[in-house]
Amino acid sequence: MYKRQVDSKTSTGTAVFTVYETGEYTVEATQGGQSTSGTVNVTASTTSYAITLAFVSDTLNDNDWDTISEVSDAGEGANYWAIGDRKQVTLNGTVGSLSLSNFSTYAFIIGFNHNSGREGSGRIHFQLAKTALSGGTDICFTDGQYLNTGSSAAFRMNTSNTNSGGWEDSYMRNNICGTSKSTTSGRIMGAIPAELRNALKSVTKYTNNNGSSSASSAVTATTDYFFLLSEYEVFGNITYSNSYEANYQQQYAYYSAGNSKVKYRHNSTGSAAYWWLRSPRVSHSNNFVNVNTSGSVNSSNAHDSLGFAPGFCV
């Protein structure tokens, strides 16, 4: 193998060099005591080859979302970071009826390659949110309609009191979370930074998408970017939702480790909140499951406005 060392201190971080033999070349970059490398297979003398090298910090928050995504693609997230590690996110925009302006919060890791056989590999699963890089408070987002029923834009599962259609057809999924990177108005998708939006990966989630049915056939797949967690993903058991959801889901590592399930209102962090899960309650045509203010499983009417604590994958 032909070897050539190139030292570059260009402002762009780009180095260009010529090799004189075909074959596999290792390219290494060093910066601030960190090193990273990759290989290029040169097969023709008249072709230009490019490789992008990223420096990865073992402090999650010191990495940009592109770097986090590349580490995730390689299935290496757990080699750098830990469950519960946090990354700052600034939110701007209106989600439902909640207006957020330069709201700084922290996404935290809840799983590495979680349930990858069904949901997809090369994914780090996050949830929103915490108030600080360390310590702080677990929060969910609450709007001016919190604990009220109604049909207006708010953090409701549906604008009418029904769980028909389950998670798939819910107002929460389609109008608050959003199902496309390009449909952003009124959705959390539109409030996140563009860098995070570009790094988002779709995930396959299984849920009772019938509503009140207890049949196995009611549990079907959706493709999501933002999603609510399910009863089983949080608690590791089923109390109110379709028992067959457990056949397709796994409890998130963050919650199986015993971390608190209690979340507080983002705009009143001394007040614990009810926060929605995506699972419909079986044998109740108007309820979805949620987590109550003591961190226990609960269910409420679909048109109630409760706390919003979405997950996403990078």
Regions found by a protein language model. Give the residues of each.
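Short, acidic Ser/Thr/Gly-rich low-complexity loop/linker segments typical of extracellular
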Residues: 6-18
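Intrinsic-disorder/low-complexity, polar/charged segments enriched in Ser/Thr/Lys/Arg/Asp/Glu/Gln
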Residues: 14-16, 24, 35-37, 46-50, ...
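Generic structural detector for well-ordered beta-strands
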Residues: 16-18, 39-41, 108
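A short, solvent-exposed beta-strand micro-motif common in secreted/extracellular proteins
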Residues: 21-32
